[in-house]
């Protein structure tokens, strides 16, 4: 799985960085968890404040386009981000925690 950053914009009004990216892969579309972990590694960001908002498959290609946000802190993320996006990203973190406990 390869990630290419299309744009990286700082948005000081909403206390975040906004990243648009493309993901190239060989088999099935990667999960949000996999993309999030790869973005954490590529961007050297904290996984607690990184949110993958969208990940859309490009028809007929082994590529997907995505949009992620890196907040300055968790408080800003909790007040600005919608519940559905937080749940989508939080479920992945909870699954990670359960695996780590076992």
Curated annotation (Swiss-Prot):
SUPFAM superfamilies: Ribosomal proteins S24e, L23 and L15e. Gene3D superfamilies: 3.30.70.330. The keyword Ribonucleoprotein applies. InterPro entries: Nucleotide-bd_a/b_plait_sf, Ribosomal_eS24, Ribosomal_eS24_CS, Ribosomal_uL23/eL15/eS24_sf. Signal peptide: none annotated. One of its GO terms (cellular component) is ribonucleoprotein complex. The keyword Cell membrane does not apply. Keywords: Ribonucleoprotein, Ribosomal protein. One of its GO terms (molecular function) is structural constituent of ribosome. Belongs to the eukaryotic ribosomal protein eS24 family. This is Small ribosomal subunit protein eS24. It comes from Methanococcus maripaludis (strain C7 / ATCC BAA-1331). The lineage of its organism: Archaea, Methanobacteriati, Methanobacteriota, Methanomada group, Methanococci. The gene is rps24e.
């Amino acid at each position: 799985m390869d990630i290419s950053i299309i744009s990286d914009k700082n948005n000081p009004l909403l206390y975040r960085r906004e990243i648009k990216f493309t993901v190239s892969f060989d088999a099935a579309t990667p999960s949000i968890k996999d993309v999030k972990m790869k973005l954490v590694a590529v961007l050297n960001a904290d996984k607690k404040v990184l949110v993958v908002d969208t990940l859309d498959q490009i028809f007929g290609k082994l590529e997907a386009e995505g949009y992620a946000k890196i907040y300055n802190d968790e408080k800003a993320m909790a007040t600005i981000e919608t519940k559905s996006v937080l749940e989508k990203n939080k479920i992945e973190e909870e699954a990670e925690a359960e695996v780590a406990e076992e």
